[in-house]
Amino acid sequence: VPGNKDTTLNTIRGLEGLPAHLTHIQFHSYGNEGDFKFSSGAAEIAELVNANKNISIDVGQVMFGQTVTASGDNMRQFANNHHADPKKWVCMDIECDAGCGVVPFRYKDQNFVNALQWAIGLETFLLVDDPWRVFLTTDHPNGAPFTTYPHLIRLLMDKSFRQDMLQTINP
């Protein structure tokens, strides 16, 4: 949701030194600036994480390619079924008490939102000073399968490779 970075920032501030781990923070690091009202809030979040030693995070890095979204929020999965790629998905309800949904999804490097999500994750990894407080994750399978970890590690460790990849995505 564009603008959700404010909730993340307020959550960190509101903890007032209590220890906390924030999961899949890339999905909660969106600003609402720019022509499309969708931007990165990673720098602000990384700055606050760096200033609050009580906070650890995992990134939930988006990687380009095929994955699936899996969630117990079957109503959200139902609402997102039009994004299914390929156009097959499943959603089930168990006596109105519980449910789940699985929607196949393809993150595309030429899609503005997907490219920005990818960049926000990398930005977060690279701006948090203490590597022991930022965990390498893709929110498997939602951001990408864990099998993309070698590619992600290369993106983080090889600046020229990262720059080459940046040249190929949606500007």
Residue ranges and their predicted role:
Residues V1-R133:
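Histidine/acidic residue-rich metal-binding segments in metalloenzymes
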Residues T138-D139:
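Divalent metal-coordination and catalytic microenvironments
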Residues H151-R154, R162:
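C-terminal, non-catalytic macromolecule-binding modules
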Residues F161-P171:
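Generic long, charged, amphipathic alpha-helical segments
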